[in-house]
Amino acid sequence: MFLLEQRELPERERYLTLTDSAGVAEAIRTMAVRGAPAIGIAAAYGMALAARAARDEGASSYVAAMRAAGEHLASTRPTAVNLGWAVRRAIAAALQNAGRRGEERARELAELAREIHREDVAACHQMGRAGAARLPESGTVLTHCNAGALATGGYGTALGVIRAAIEAGKALRVLACETRPYLQGARLTAWELQRDGIPVEVISDSMAAWFMQKGEIGAVVVGADRIARNGDVANKIGTYGLACLARHHGIPFYVAAPWSTIDLATDSGASIPIEERSRDELAVVGGRRVVPPGVPVRHPAFDVTPAELVTAVFTERGKLTTREISRSVPPAAPAG
């Protein structure tokens, strides 16, 4: 498995070569790959590698190995629901093919990973079309973190909406919040959009209110790592603040995410686990410590935006209000 090392962008484009599920889990944990749909896809390929490693085991040993690999992968990033969703699909497939041996097991899991990958790309295009009509004909769209091709199987969720709008002839430019402390907006969103020829400017996270106050921003579009049944949205830390600002300034606040990001088993955002990451990711910048030794650092990686602040959610099923989410019936999930 070859994986673009996102931590080194935009300075260098380098691919990791991963040969087992443990390597994939480490790449997810350390954010060499990130973005809820992308880590779900990566986990699916990781499960295919686990199936390959256990291809000659007896049925019970094979299933045990697959469950262990799945548990390891699912534990790496607890907030993103796509990760567990992809692992459960892979374990369900492993239960079904446990009676087979050899390469057939590995081939079936590899094909499932490719299927999950294809589904995500198709979903991104569908939600892009659903959201494009809601963006203004011209002006500036604000986005946060990176919800583009790098965070998905391709095309993107929030950036997919922007791409689709521009492909439809709308004259839009993008303001990308830098997104401290990992700088996904500055490093990844700006890199993607520049490569696509889409006008983009980077601002610090604290500048968003100023540009809203000046009337420069016509819409906010972000991705999501998990959406609860009531429509609460967990996304990169700082999203909630942008939603509050958008409401104050009368700016529509949109969320774009595949249906796999909607967790109907979680009643509200209060039940979504919020990942706490290392203090050094915040306290060390460019190899230099910027926080005095001994001073505590808090580093929640995500926050929760209440449903009432979300104008609409764009999925492959079309535009949904947060109230409509709770009334939706999810596709049947594989057992396992």
Curated annotation (Swiss-Prot):
Query: What pathway, per the record?
Result: Amino-acid biosynthesis; L-methionine biosynthesis via salvage pathway; L-methionine from S-methyl-5-thio-alpha-D-ribose 1-phosphate: step 1/6
The active site consists of 225 (proton donor)
In its UniProt record, which GO terms are filed under biological process? Answer: L-methionine salvage from methylthioadenosine
Keyword Amino-acid biosynthesis among record annotations: yes
**Site feature Transition state stabilizer, where:** 145
Instruction: Write the Enzyme Commission number(s) for this entry.
Output: 5.3.1.23
Q: Print the keywords alphabetically.
A: Amino-acid biosynthesis, Isomerase, Methionine biosynthesis
Binding residues annotated for substrate, in chain numbering: 34-36, 77, 184, 235-236
Reaction(s) catalysed (UniProt annotation): 5-(methylsulfanyl)-alpha-D-ribose 1-phosphate = 5-(methylsulfanyl)-D-ribulose 1-phosphate
Q: Which GO terms describe its molecular function?
A: S-methyl-5-thioribose-1-phosphate isomerase activity
Q: Identify its protein family.
A: Belongs to the eIF-2B alpha/beta/delta subunits family. MtnA subfamily.
- Record's PANTHER family? METHYLTHIORIBOSE-1-PHOSPHATE ISOMERASE
The UniProt function text for this chain reads: Catalyzes the interconversion of methylthioribose-1-phosphate (MTR-1-P) into methylthioribulose-1-phosphate (MTRu-1-P).
Q: What is this protein called?
A: Methylthioribose-1-phosphate isomerase
- What are the leading ranks of the lineage? Bacteria, Pseudomonadati, Myxococcota, Polyangia, Polyangiales
Give me the gene this protein comes from: mtnA
